[in-house]
Amino acid sequence: MSQSVKIEGSLLAKNTVLNFIGQVVPLFVAVITIPFIIQGLGADRFGILSLAWIIIGYFSILNLGLGRATTKFVAEALGKDEMEKIPAIVWTSLASQLFLGILGGVILIILTPILVKQILNIPIDLIKETKTTFYLLSLSIPVVICSASLRGVLEAAQRFDLVNAIKIPSSCLNFLLPLIGVFLGFRLPGIIILLLISRIGTMMAYLILCFHVYPKIRKVFLINIQFFRPLFSFGGWITICNILIPILVYLDRFFIGTVCPIAYVGYYSVCYDVLSRLGIFPGSFAMTLFPAFSTLESNKYKLKCLYVCSLKYMLLIMGPIILVLVIFAGDILHLWLGSNWASKTTLVFQILAVGIFLNALAQMPANLLDGIGRPDLRAKIFLSYVLPYVALLWFLIIKFGIIGAALAWALRACVELILFFGIVWKIMGLNRAILIENGLLRGVTVYGGIIIMASSTIAVLGKTLLVRGITTAICLILFVLITWRYILDIGDKHTLFLTVSRLGK
């Protein structure tokens, strides 16, 4: 690569779609293959395989955020046209990742006897097989951690076409190889060996593509200790976020199980798990935006415009979906799970849907903070409200049960959005004019008007399915027409047409 990356709307849109596909396809493969894997392995062995997947996920935190740090600093170098820095950034990060991965593997080897014999409830006849499985799994940890950094190098250059060309098949193989192993009569160690070979192949494919995109990486092998501090400083704050986010997201279910009858955990979890699937789109968009924000860090005006537009696009895409889900929540749950379930979870579903929407919007300023090298601000926001949130969550669950849990989750998402937006507003020097210029203010106004129109019409005419259906259809048609006429500018429309035409080809 001889020149810096040019950040364009059509490129970001195409990459978002690619990332979306990259998350959806393996999900479908998992849904299809898992029943056959369970049938072939049996419940106990499948449980151990599931633990192996979880362990790889947890040990990946040992990369200390260096994968995201690599993406940030390579993208920043591209934005400043400082190509000579990239080999040192990449090799320094990889060396660090390799060391941490080996350390993680050694830790797993040491912990395996304790995990298998004392902590996990493993059947006696499977203890030896489980130990062998975990020992083999330890070899995967450095491979998985290094792969994350190499993938991040490609993401920095907005080469999500190459990333997903590797990521989609490798993610699918995570489920297909156990199925193949079952048909071949393999036990768990054999399946783990197949997965290890696949992961090594994935890592090598990423490395070869990095050599292709950045030829200097192949020619210049350089580990520069000057990069250790910025890499680990950035990655350290990312790690704090990665530790806190699962706690904030999943603590509600633990509290529900403590305060309410255990069945209510299921009522709540089903609503959350279904709605959380909507996070695939903002997650795909955020994955694309992070390196773009880093690349544009030296061009403040373009960075501001991209950030404001990202909020606008998220509002325009997620807003109508959430509106439909809130209006028809009871009908959806009734058809899917029955009237008894719907009566207990409709309001929970509606509140969580609003929370998911606010969380999707909050991902935009959160990614901007990471992109401009301020993940410390994101981590400090999480740290500032974690204890008040825990107290509020506990109080609301005691007072209102699972409705209180949903309310606490949505309030947390709202506070998060306000804090992230406020900090970005201040440090980026945003103003009302740039919100108007890029259509965000009009988008918020129109969406708010549509919500008021829909809710007031339903309140006056009644909540029958016919009234709600006609009202929703009219509101959505108006929203689309107004959006096309007054919110999307010429550049947005050109990007939309170009993206559709590219995908069509």
List each language-model region with its residue ranges.
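Interhelical loop/hinge segments that connect adjacent transmembrane helices in multipass membrane
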Residues: 1-12, 206-249, 297-305, 426-442, ...
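Hydrophobic alpha-helical transmembrane segments
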Residues: 166-213, 230, 234, 383-388, ...
